[in-house]
Amino acid sequence: MGRSYGGRVLAAMTLLGIPAAVLVALAAQLLFQLQAGRAELRRVRTDGLHPELDPDAGLPEAAAGALLPLATALAALAQVLGLSCLLLAALCGHLGAELARGPGPGRSDWFLYDCRLLRHSALGLFCCGVSVYLAALAIYALLLFEIEAGAAAASILGSGALILVAIMTHTLFRAVQATRRGLRELSPPSFEDEPARPSEDSKSGCRAQPPQDEETETPIGAVTHQGSHF
């Protein structure tokens, strides 16, 4: 039972670390694309708008110049959140695997049971990173495409980010409630210390038996002594 618990936790942390690494890579790619867009915007500012360009092809220059730093900051924040989630998942998985190699297999299960707050934090960081990345991607779509298509894409991505934040908040709140309820109603998984308890009980029982034997031997000795007087 202990090994199955630890195995499930390690598998969950692995499944969380893979999309966190993908999120870090996507945020880094978006950062480079936004940097290229900023260089293009600077070139347009220095060269001036060509008369043959359609002014309705995208956002105005002032709006684009204001949204580009915001999108860059959001992409960098998404990368930091994804990297933090990846490091927490890797740390919990590595320490759990190292403790499983010890003399007692229950040490790993106790550690993974006690670090559930870190696992909840890693999941929250990942969901926040995805939400921030969707917000940055919405701004980038608004800058890249035409006004109509960019506004539609930005609204869809922004609504998805808000829905994800709401789901994440509700899920983490329920997880915290379930954890507190489990700590009150359920006992933590028994792994290593319980097999030692019966041996201690048996030793204490063996130590308690000799005084009883002495008490039973005392009346017998008294009876034999009285018989000798008769």
Swiss-Prot record:
The chain crosses the membrane at residues 12-32, 73-93, 125-145, 147-167. Residues 194-204 have a biased composition (Basic and acidic residues). It comes from the Eukaryota. One of its GO terms (cellular component) is membrane. The keyword Secreted does not apply. Keywords: Membrane, Transmembrane, Transmembrane helix. Its main location: membrane. It is a multi-pass membrane protein. Residues 184-230 are annotated as: Disordered. Signal peptide: none annotated. The keyword Transit peptide does not apply. It is found in: Membrane. This is Transmembrane protein 221. The lineage of its organism: Eukaryota, Metazoa, Chordata, Craniata, Vertebrata.
